């Protein structure tokens, strides 16, 4: 089946993107409250893949990579900044795998990246804002790599 892009799908009706990874992964026992860093993509990738499939089964048209809070600031706080890129790349690859893996005759899901808020952005003190921009730019860069430089790129 030919895969339609987002605009084509929206022209035909609503497009659903399931959300709620953070609290559902915590509820399932794969994340502790506190900093809420998505280490599950490295520590238990099968659990993250299963959650994506559950959302897909529930009707989500878009598989959203669980990279929320997977940025340099949060990784620094938990002392795992060196795992930043592997965490993001793993989460993106898992989402892409699930998005493209559908039953025969079923249109593949779209895939999306995800960034979160930052606790260091301050519109009154711009000294940290370049760091925030860089932090999110690198996440977007890894998502672009995942989409463009691997086979069967999702939209």
What do the predicted segments below correspond to?
Residues 19, 55, 95:
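Conserved, mostly hydrophobic/aromatic
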Residues 48, 88-92, 132-136:
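Aromatic/hydrophobic pocket-lining residues that form the small-molecule binding cavity
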Residues 58-59, 94-109, 142-148:
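A structural motif corresponding to the C-terminal end of an alpha-helix
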Residues 149-155:
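Conserved small/polar residues in nucleotide/adenosyl-binding loops
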């Amino acid at each position: 089946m030919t895969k339609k892009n987002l605009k084509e799908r929206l022209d035909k009706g609503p497009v659903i993107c399931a959300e709620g990874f953070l609290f559902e992964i915590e509820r399932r026992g794969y994340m502790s409250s506190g900093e809420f860093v998505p280490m599950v993509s490295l520590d238990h990738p099968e659990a993250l893949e299963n959650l994506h499939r559950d959302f897909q089964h529930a009707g989500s048209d878009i598989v959203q990579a669980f990279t929320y809070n997977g940025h340099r600031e949060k990784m620094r706080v938990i002392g795992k900044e060196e795992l930043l890129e592997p965490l993001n790349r793993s989460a993106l690859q898992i989402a892409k795998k699930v998005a493209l893996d559908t039953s025969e005759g079923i249109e593949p899901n779209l895939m999306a990246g995800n960034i979160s808020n930052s606790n260091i952005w301050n519109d009154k003190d711009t000294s940290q804002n370049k760091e925030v921009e860089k932090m999110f730019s690198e996440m977007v860069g890894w998502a672009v790599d995942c989409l463009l430089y691997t086979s069967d790129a999702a939209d």
